[in-house]
Amino acid sequence: MASSQPTSSGPILDSPPSPNPQSQLNTETSSSQHRANPSEAPAQPGPGPARPSALTKRPSHREVAAYRMSRKLQRLRADSNQPHSPTMELPDRLKDNGKEEDNEEDVLQPQGGMFMNMNQSIFGLIAAAGSTVDFHDRFEGQSSEDEDDVPNHMAMTFAGPGIKGTARNRETAGTVKSLSQTVVFNKPPASATVDAGPSNIHRRRLPGHKLLQSVPSLSRLSSSHKSKKTKQHNATAMADNKIEEEEDPDPSSPLPPLSKDETESLGLAPPIEIVRAEGNGAPLMSRMLEARAEMEARPSFDLDRLSGEHRRDDAGVTGQLAKKLKDIFEFDTAEEVIEEYPCWLLQHVLLQGYMYITANHIAFYAHLPKKAHEIAKSGYLSKSGKRNPKYNRYWFRLKGDVLSYYQDPKDHYFPAGQIDLRYGISASVNDKEKEGNYFSVSTHHRTYHFKADSARSAKEWVKSLQRVIFRSHNDGDSVKISIPIRNILDIEEAQMVEFADTCKIRVIDNDETYAIDEYFFSFFSFGKKAIQVLKVLVEDSSPEDSGANDAPKGTGGDRAIGDNLGSPRTRTFSEGVKATLSPVSPIQIASPSSRASGDYFKSSFDGTRPFSRRSFDASPGTAGYAGSPPRRLHGDGRRSFSKPRHEPHASTDSYAQSFDDPSQASLSALVASGSEDQSASQILRGSDVFHSPIFRRSASATRATTEGEGVAAPPIVRQHTAGLVRLHGPHHAATTGQIGDHMAEAEGGPSTPMLQSIAMMGNYPLQRANAFMGYLDQQSRRMSNLLATESMGYVEKVSGMWKGGKKHYDHPAGRRTEREDVEDDPEERALSEARFQAHFALPETERLQAAYFGFIVRVLPLYGKIYISNRHFCFRSLLPGTRTKLILPLKDIETVDKEKGFRFGYSGLVVVIRGHEEIFFEFAKAENRDDCAITIIQSLDAARYLAESQEVEEAQAAEAERDALNQARNEEFPDHEIELPRQASGVSDAPTILFDDPKASFLNFKPSEPMRITCLTIGSRGDVQPYIALCKRLLEEGHRPKIVTHREFKDWIESHGIEFGPVEGDPSELMRICIENGTFTYAFLREANSKFRGWLDELLTSAWEACQGSDLLIESPSAMAGIHIAEALGIPYFRAFTMPWTRTRAYPHAFIMPGQKMGGAYNYITYVMFDNVFWKATAHQVNRWRNKYLGLPNTSLEKLQPNKVPFLYNFSPSVVPPPIDYSDWIRVTGYWFLDEGGDKWQPPKELTDFIAKARADEKKLVYIGFGSIIVSDPAKMTQEIIDAVLKADVRCILSKGWSDRSATVDGVEKPKVADPSFPPEILQIQSAPHDWLFQQVDAAAHHGGSGTTGASLRAGIPTIIRPFFGDQFFFAGRVEDLGVGIYLKKWGVQSFARALWEATHSSRMQMRAEVLGGQIRAENGVDTAIQAIYRDLDYARNLITLKRQKHQSRRNSVATPTPGAKPNAPEDDQGQAAEEDDIDADDEEEESWTFVGGNEDDLTGSMSMSRSDMLSQTVADLRGVKVGKAPALGSRVLSSPPTSPGAMRGAGGVKYV
């Protein structure tokens, strides 16, 4: 014994600092709070020993803070890689000399350094202090009960379930009472835990200290507390130890109690029992020190935490599973695992997991990952208003913990309202309604009523909501429940689930509240055996408990807990129930119980999990929760305060509630009743920091006197019986400090309070009066201050709101002004942050950084307030009568652009969003606009990369914990496999939650027979290359692909073993027209009309011939012929392209790119305009070709329905995110890369030597190539490139490709100009595979074709784009918006040189390019495209089938066919069949009708018209032509041709196009 005492104090006190500095800071904070309050001196009245002034040898507070900050900065520095570079200083040679203007540098230049202190707000400090600080000690002196020890469980192992009395020998009825309470587990954010220490060491813990040992992070937090009060009562402890050494009491009899004098003087009920265990102390202590040193050397997160390699068996005999359970559930020792069973936890849901029965605990574990970013369910519902009973229809989306509803399902950033399910109580179908399609969701704030379209839909919504509520009430990514066997009252079998054995375990939560919790477990296998083992364990511990407690039996044979709670012989528990969620009965879904109501206050540690939710608070608008602080996890147990609460759902208050502490029970209601509206004070009233010191803790059993009164304060007694629980469900009123009167009546016994409560009633009037007087005094002082100052404050607030402005609450990169630093008020900042979180239903981890007043411009400018936090960009309208809200995650923002405002004198800001249209804002002052833009840009990288990495680490840690436990379990219990429930009759509406929710199975849609697949495309090399990659993969799938394109690509295609088919046309001529005239300009149309009529006819004819015999057609829509060929052949038809071609509000058409962001309406109209112009220019020839060669009638853009055709976009979703308004059959698959730089290709020695020399000279190396385009003056461009390379001081690999083709003018070739000679800094090559070459350079500059852009982005290098025509402007804009390159809008030596220098020196651009490159490399676009083809094949086939059926019905409905007409007649203008000229007017399949006035020759200039073009269409054609009426004028077939084309034109008809 003499050697054990120094061991416990010496090494522990002198141990190095914990690797988790948060725990040390919390301890220091707790100590400082004690010292800061003289009235709360730690000295206790009585002869007990005084508390030492210095309990432990710890580093100072400043050292701990410095250590923590250095560790945090080190971690962030490693993750961030300095994403925010300071504004770059250009060399003098590249500075603007006043002769050129460059517009691209405003956005593309990197901004200031990244903000590193996102979580350093007042709430972070509150969480840091609240995690371990005992807030009770602020309001009263130290209680002697806090000095108690708990018995060691090291030697308490069972040999098997059949051995009785083992645990009884290790525990005594006189064990010291500690304030053990149910603890919320925290998710393990750290990598390792510290061994609990030698079992034979006399240790002192904080009250209920083992409750902190739920996860390894808690172990580190608790390690700093283990020696806090070790030196206290050393003499007494030594004496007690001697008694225990000399005496060997009978296991069945309790130890003799201490005398009354000893009890009162020491504040201790029984003596401390020290149980010896095997092993020596020194090796264990050395292992503790080694473990701590190992933890300090590790980073903050390590997935090897559960690997077991660095751990040693504490006792040397336990198995691997026991060690894992010790790590996960933080047992003191590795307890022997008696049995393990797969089971289901029954609450609102059925949760699949495993039960582990150890010597001293029953543990339940289930992996339940958070799904904060997944949409659980979406669809239309009707919702009634708060005051209006009418049901309005909205689009609902259940994502994360929030149920949001929208007026427009495509505007998911603008919710019409939100329901925060973290405060959810339950979701249930209303049984009163016969239809069964009404359901409600209850929260602490209010009850919401919904109406679904069907009863089935309502049940599905309820089940999804129950799952989300369950997940939101669990802290972390796993459900953990640890029940000490000594706390179990009884175990009953309950028939609740058919084909399963269900047991109900009633547990005393802790020995302060004596709440009785119920846990229901169902076993679909091994059920009888499991329940028998549990009963044997409970029977082993019950004799000792009954003998020690002598508690009388209540009704129904259950114990009535608490009759003798005031006695020193009170039954106590060494620890309480530990759980990540509170127990809820499965039969109590709609029960007005505190447990059922979701009173699950969560806790987490901001120091170790800066992005997690710190606490789960009650709704700030509920009066009943005014005095309810959030439940924080620290040494005191379940809540920071154990004072009672008012439940809004319960009935009248009982004696136990009213007389527990009148100052709390009444004053909280008084404060809450002052205002019904949500305010900042109400939002923050749940936080311990904002509680008045007059709130005192209720007296406990071992406290002799209350602090302020000096009168006896016996403990509160709360009685529960099994009959009560069975009648009303497990109300668990003791856990919230109240029992309803209806509960006392249902109990069947008298509701008279105990003598202790009666004694307390005598003091109630005086205490109530004192509390009320204190409240009045406080309110009077507050009102006087309000009259003096607040009136002016409100005026200032309102005037400031309308005047506009800005304010920085947090200070990223020094954005705060000096005035803001001087006027900074932490309390005001906390209030503003809480209001912000309440406005947008955001978690408390959301840190408000800045706020601005401005206008959001949608249809009309709307005034409001802009909020920027560490994760979201939000807007809230301030005009009365408006409710516009914007909630935009920062990770969805690509960039922000500064532009002119829509109104004169206003400055505009454009927020570019992934897959969504831009959002425009206006500011009254340009400086506020600039400040807002800089703040957003500085926050983007941290929100996009750091936050995601943190979430990934947390998820990986939970998975590692699960995998380690499964591995150990499978080794010891390989035959215990879980079974799914066949039928849940007792809880038929309870949804099941599996370990990992299975995704929809990926079915194999591959056709059984190989197909002949034809790919039709025209254009440049970049248009053909993706199809080669696709066809190579189709060959591997067993199909027979064929590429139909220009003849110049024949050898290239056939070299890959792919069949080739030719089409006519010269792509270089088309490119020349586009470059010289622009894409689809008036000059382009005029020249194309005059020169490309014949080219289009040849293209259509050759394409029809080349596609014969195909089973599937995939076409680039620029080829124009494929959709008609597929219709004629009756084969499925897909489209595939390299740029957006489908109508959307997110991006403008790639051929009609504006000079600035124009918004969603403009973007959409560009597609409509292009489709109509493109069809109008080609309709005449296409319809004539359809009639002559395909045997099809005339068609129109509406009848073709191109927007319903399945589409494959072969670019990356990371580069062009799919817009939210894309249909299901439109898929962005990823790039179709053709890697040709493999082993077969060897780079020239000249190229490798040039690259090596550039690296040796430490020069930046760039690639420049404009290979697929034609330039008017190649020599001039070459000279500009040479000058820019020399000016930027880089080395260049130049590839010209097609750019040296000579253009022709009027058939005469222009004379070639000799290219200038290249300096040694430039190496010219003819060609090289991009997949090899781009990996050798630091940046790439090219024309911006889709394939080349994808190759450079995949390499992860910055990209400079100089667009020439077509989609190149679109991809240049995308590269600029993503921040991975430069859009070179102005070409010249100076501009190009500056772009080269910035691309090779901007670390921010390089980091973003590398991240994007990794995302693209992780994709497999070709495989994704093939799977999409298989999935949509039937859909495409059905579209063609419907069209052919329509053609047949048209043929049958023709009234007067033309005699002798032949569908495939070679004549152009004579003898057309009837089906070609009858446009079915009664076509219900059409999307819309388009009537174009005038004639085809208005555009083409041609004066000749075919007979098929002389049909007139009137409005009467829209009515029922097929129902027996005479054909309308426009639908009649002209049996005899008119005398002249002008005769029909003179009739003034409207021609159908």
From Swiss-Prot:
The keyword Nucleus does not apply. Sterol glycosyltransferase responsible for the glycosylation of ergosterol to form ergosterol-glucoside. It is a peripheral membrane protein. GO terms for biological process: autophagy; carbohydrate metabolic process; lipid glycosylation; protein transport; sterol biosynthetic process; sterol metabolic process. Transmembrane segments: none annotated. It is found in: Cytoplasm; Preautophagosomal structure membrane. Residues 1-10, 25-36, 651-662 have a biased composition (Polar residues). This is Sterol 3-beta-glucosyltransferase. Keywords: Autophagy, Cytoplasm, Glycosyltransferase, Lipid biosynthesis, Lipid metabolism, Membrane, Protein transport, Repeat, Steroid biosynthesis, Steroid metabolism, Sterol biosynthesis, Sterol metabolism, Transferase, Transport. Its EC number is 2.4.1.-, 2.4.1.173. Residues 1466-1488 have a biased composition (Acidic residues). GO terms for molecular function: sterol 3-beta-glucosyltransferase activity; UDP-glycosyltransferase activity. Residues 90-100, 633-650, 810-819 have a biased composition (Basic and acidic residues). Residues 374-470 form the PH domain. Residues 1-106, 189-270, 542-569, 611-662, 805-825, 1446-1504, 1527-1553 are annotated as: Disordered.
